[in-house]
A protein has these predicted regions:
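Long, compositionally biased intrinsically disordered regions
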Residues: 461, 474-561, 702, 711, ...
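Non-catalytic, conformational "gating/processing" segments within enzyme and secreted inhibitor domains
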Residues: 187, 239-271, 754-789
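Hydrophobic, small-residue-rich alpha-helical packing segments that form membrane-like cores
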Residues: 180-181, 185-195, 203-238, 242-248, ...
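His/Glu-based metal-binding/catalytic segments typifying zinc-dependent metallopeptidases
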Residues: 69-71, 78-80, 191, 195-199, ...
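Short, positively charged and aromatic/hydrophobic N-terminal segments
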Residues: 2-22, 26-28
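M16 family metallopeptidases and their MPP-like homologs
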Residues: 74-84, 110-158, 165-176, 203-228, ...
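Active-site recognition of the HExxH zinc-binding catalytic motif
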Residues: 89-101, 608-609
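Non-catalytic terminal extensions that flank enzyme cores
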Residues: 24-78, 292
Length: 1002
């Protein structure tokens, strides 16, 4: 997995829930001072995260070790290495993939996948950054956690990469020639992954900005790998990289949570670190010398041959902001990013939008590299607007310095960031993982300063005190206006660039093949065959058995509890979830959409996108956003869908318009007041603002389709037969995009009618008799809720309205959507219940088996795709999908082979147990207070009973091989639906266009 800065994209195991620290004893910190093999360098009380921290160094090997102990049982271990790339061959990235493909003590071909299949991990992955490579694991089970640590330490220090070159050729790159007279090509998992990454214009922009700002240090090179350069990497260079950087002296070892730290340190020393002597590793990240003047560079990205170049250019303004070792500056620019750029109506965003420069103004502050970068980006602009773009930005910045930044915006930014810090809810990721990654923002560059960013309470206090003092204005002057270490980067479209480069590559490979002797060509064929044979060889049983596996008996049969208490407050139905939340109330106000017609659904999607970022009767939209973030932890809207699992054959579902907020109990009154303001007082006749939002929405939808093409394609294919999937597609998918694009392109004719329709929808939807509330809090958080709910209900529409039943018609289309990408997202879907096959808990095991065995081996390992997934749910929907896949027809053939694979499914009892444990691992993720409430409400709305969950769990824990073989009929039913949607390269889709009923471009 490749990552730029702090943005992490997970393709494999990604549905992980974080664990939240509540109250507990942090005084039982380990007595590591008695361990003579380590030197204690720092010992700190980390009050901000309620933990104790110790910085150590292993005396013999020079390994840096950081311990963070609290009572969080979601334990985290990671080992990281500083890995500055010297070129763009992607060797750090290829190494990250390769070391997880077998090691001295765990010689199986893919221990990583074996762990995914058979451990209770709450996180398991690895990430390549521009200057480091990180290998983190997490688990709540002590035995499992130790197993994960063992496999990962062995992988990074004793990988099998030295035994043969097949892992390098599989994960990195290799020549592929199936027969002597065939076409020569490149293949490799990383090679294909980066072809996908380089197909996105946002990806191109991120990379060229980094390379432009730092021409003289490691950031000038592409650590993930440039597909044009990856094939220059030799096997010996690959091995040299490991010899150089993968040594304990260049490592950063991190342990977090509730565990016996002394025991872990002894184990690390005795099993691994004591076998190494200290070594000088030249991996220092050098500072880039500042420029004498701002640089200007222009690059190209590819669009489809029939796509317009008009309003398709990216303009970016980028400045380097000190270093990440400046504690206050590191956080201060997060606040400035909010106040100047990211918040709706922020001055930079508003000025550029008003000037007509770009349809979507974005920005970022990347403090995940040594020298952070502040960026302003105008998407869907014209290259000719570059000079005006720079002028508008700098005029706004000068005005902010002269007249002062909006103090409420600064306070809102500080409160927003501090609330997130104190809440410590990282959604799908363990808290300890995210702390560990943030620690690396300073520790990597100064081995004596690991804690400066996770111990942030003093920093927030400092930043609050600086509001109104001129501090922030001085930062703008120094780091943005007077700073010459910057770059104006233009990324402009080129029609058919992908096809042109592919033709050049094919010509180059053909000429290379022609230059070879017959013997050399035959060797390429033999090497291709040898790699395929290696990939197809069954694992040696003895090697697999070296990977530790828990027993079924280690798994509890108990299910996680529900927290649903029905009540009425102010005559409004409330489902209350009594959970300790550290004084935060999580409110979700839900409005039924069953009275909205199918023809109105796109407008509902637009309404959801508009509310909260448009003026209201009492606030300009920028003031509204600041008012919310000064007083609460945030308010947002969404459209949700709940399938009734007791009426599957009737395809019954309930859709809702939801507005969610979170705040300290003392601020809940304000939260409800702001919700009422958004729902009842928004100025939906502000057509100028609606036009801006539609342009932004169109841009963001395209970005989503490009970055998450697998989910988009799966949803679209499901929508051919599923009313609930069709609903989602009409409100957030491809169908919705088409409607948004049409209205945006014909806005002058559409605007008045659209405004009227949006107002009418607010009257139809936002009614007290159409409302229910989900509320998560401790019992004391119920106090005062009734009058708050009554006040909200009182402001809603009480007039009678005409409701129209939502009748959705589905139609099978089998579409291919052409893009300028070099890879495909191939989705095949169907409903097995429609074909007479019932749901069983064993289908959750099937998802693990297919995603990490049959599909993994055939689509990723042999096919070179980056990812592959499958899913089967309670309402009968099943899908197979690939991610960043160089193939199309071949992948569909792999899907067709699932039935035969399952009919002949035979594994050992040990492997069967492993699949079951991996399945339970996905189900038993630790939950934050917020996610406990959300899970309870989702089960309530979907009519899923505790008995259903218990039955499903028992079916999983008691499953045998014959239960998996019986699922062949499920796969057969899904494939029989013959529902196909592919998003991918125009050449590949045109090549296989006979597969589709319709081929079109976005």
């Amino acid at each position: 997995m490749y990552s730029k800065g702090l943005t992490v994209y997970f393709v494999e195991k990604c549905d992980i829930i974080a664990s939240v620290y509540e109250k507990g004893d942090i005084g039982k910190f380990m007595s590591v001072k008695d361990l003579t093999t380590y030197e204690v360098l720092k010992d700190e009380d980390l009050k901000g995260i309620k933990a104790k921290g110790k910085l150590l160094k292993h005396k013999k090997s020079g390994a840096r070790v950081l311990l963070v102990e609290n009572d969080d049982n979601n334990k985290v271990f990671s080992i990281a290495f500083r890995t500055p790339p010297s070129d763009s061959t992607g060797v750090p990235h290829i190494m990250e993939h390769s070391v997880l493909c077998g090691s001295k003590n765990f010689p199986a071909k893919d221990p990583f996948v074996e762990l995914v299949k058979g451990s209770l991990n709450t996180f398991l992955n690895a990430m390549t950054y521009p200057d480091k490579t990180v290998y983190p694991v997490a688990s709540c089970n002590d035995k499992d956690f130790q197993n994960l640590m063992h496999v990962y330490m062995d992988a990074v220090l004793y990988p099998n990469i030295y035994n043969h070159d097949k892992t390098f050729r599989q994960e990195g790159w290799s020549y592929k020639l199936d027969e002597k007279d065939g076409e020569l090509s490149y293949n490799g998992v990383v090679y294909n992954e980066m072809k996908g990454a380089f197909s996105s214009p946002e990806g191109v922009l991120d990379r060229v900005v980094l390379n432009t700002l730092f021409p003289d240090n490691c950031y000038a090179n592409e650590s993930g790998g440039d597909p044009e350069v990856i094939p220059q990497l030799t096997y010996e260079q690959f091995l040299d990289f490991h010899r150089t950087y993968y040594h304990p002296s260049n490592s950063y070892i991190y342990l977090y949570g509730d565990m016996d730290m002394e025991e872990k340190l002894r184990w690390l020393d005795e099993e691994y670190l004591c076998h190494y002597d200290k070594k000088d590793v030249n991996s220092e990240i050098h500072l880039q010398k500042p420029f004498d003047e701002v640089q200007e560079k222009t690059f190209e990205y590819s669009i489809a041959s029939d796509e317009s170049t008009e309003e398709n250019t990216f303009l970016s303004y980028n400045k380097v902001i000190g270093t990440t070792l400046d504690r206050e500056l590191y956080q201060a620019f997060e606040i400035l990013d909010y106040a100047l750029l990211s918040a709706p109506g922020a001055p930079l965003k508003k000025a550029l939008t008003d000037a007509g420069i770009g349809k979507d103004i974005m920005g970022s502050y990347d403090n995940g590299v040594y020298q952070p970068i502040f960026s302003v980006v105008a998407k869907n602009a014209e290259e000719s607007q570059k000079d005006e773009f720079v002028k508008v930005i700098e005029d706004v910045l000068r005005d902010q310095v002269k007249n002062g930044i909006n103090q409420k915006a600064l306070l809102a930014g500080i409160n927003y960031n501090e609330f997130r810090y104190r809440e410590a809810d990282f959604g799908n990721y363990p808290k300890g993982l995210m702390y560990g990654l943030q620690i690396m923002d300073s520790w990597l560059y100064d081995e004596n300063q690991p804690f400066i960013h996770i111990e942030a309470l003093e920093t927030f206090a400092f930043l609050k005190n600086k509001v109104g003092t001129g501090y922030y204005e001085e930062l703008i002057q120094k780091y943005l206006l007077d700073n010459t270490h910057g770059a104006i980067v233009v990324v402009r479209p080129e029609q058919g660039r992908t096809a042109r480069l592919d033709a050049q590559l094919q010509d180059k490979l053909q000429k290379y093949k022609e230059s070879l002797s017959n013997a050399e060509v035959e060797k390429l064929v033999a090497d291709t065959k040898a790699l395929e044979e290696y990939q197809s060889e069954p694992e040696v049983i003895e090697n697999l058995e070296k990977i530790p596996v828990l027993r079924r008996e280690d798994i509890s049969r108990e299910i996680a509890p529900f927290f649903n208490e029905e009540m009425k407050l102010a005559d409004v139905p409330v489902v209350y979830h009594e959970i300790e939340t550290n004084g935060i109330g999580y409110v979700n106000v839900m409005f039924d959409l069953s009275g909205v017609s199918a023809e109105e659904l796109a407008d509902v999607g637009i309404l959801q996108s508009v509310l909260g970022i448009i003026d209201t009767e009492n606030y300009e939209y920028s003031e509204l956003f600041n008012e919310i973030n000064v007083n609460t932890g945030g308010i947002g809207t969404s459209l949700e869908l709940y399938n009734n699992v007791t009426r599957v054959k009737e395809k019954e579902f309930k859709a809702t318009f939801e507005i969610k907020g979170k705040a300290l109990y003392s601020q809940l009154e304000k939260t409800f007041a702001m919700m009422a303001e958004i729902l009842t007082a928004s100025k939906l006749d502000d057509t100028k603002r609606i036009r801006e939002i539609l342009a932004m929405l169109k841009s963001r939808l395209i970005m989503k389709f490009q970055s998450s093409g697998h989910t988009t394609a799966a949803l679209r294919a499901l929508s051919y037969a599923s009313p609930s999937a069709k609903f989602k597609d009409m409100t957030s998918g491809i169908d919705f995009y088409k409607r948004v694009a049409y209205i945006e392109e014909h806005f002058d004719e559409e605007k008045e009618a659209l405004s009227q329709r949006l107002y009418a929808l607010t009257k139809k939807i936002f009614r007290p008799d159409n409302m229910m509330i989900s509320y998560t809090a401790a019992r004391e958080g119920l106090e005062g809720m009734e009058p708050r709910i009554a006040e909200l209900a009182g402001r809603l529409n009480h007039e009678k309205v005409t409701e129209t039943p939502c009748i959705i018609h589905c139609e099978k289309k089998n579409e291919g959507f052409k893009t300028a990408s070099k890879v495909q997202y191939v989705a095949r879907t169907g409903n097995f219940i429609d074909r007479g096959v019932e749901y069983t808990g064993a289908l959750q095991i099937l998802k693990v088996i297919l995603s990490y065995d049959y599909l993994w081996q055939n689509i990723r390992v042999k096919g070179g795709a980056y990812g592959c997934m499958s899913s089967f749910n309670r309402i009968g929907e099943g899908y197979f999908v690939s991610y960043r896949d160089p193939n199309l027809k071949r992948t569909i053939d792999v899907y067709e082979g699932v039935v035969d694979y399952l009919e002949n499914f035979t594994v050992s009892d040990r492997d069967m147990t492993k699949y079951i444990i991996g399945t339970i691992s996905n189900m038993d993720q630790p939950m934050t207070p917020a996610t406990k409430g959300e899970r309870s409400m989702n089960l309530y709305m979907n009519k899923v009973s505790a008995e259903m969950i218990k039955k499903e769990r028992a079916q999983i824990l008691d499953a045998a091989q014959e239960d998996i073989r019986a699922l062949a009929k499920v796969a057969k039913a899904v494939l029989a639906a013959d529902q196909l949607c592919v998003i991918g390269g125009e050449e590949k889709i045109e090549e296989d266009k006979e597969l589709f009923g319709d081929v079109t471009s976005f």
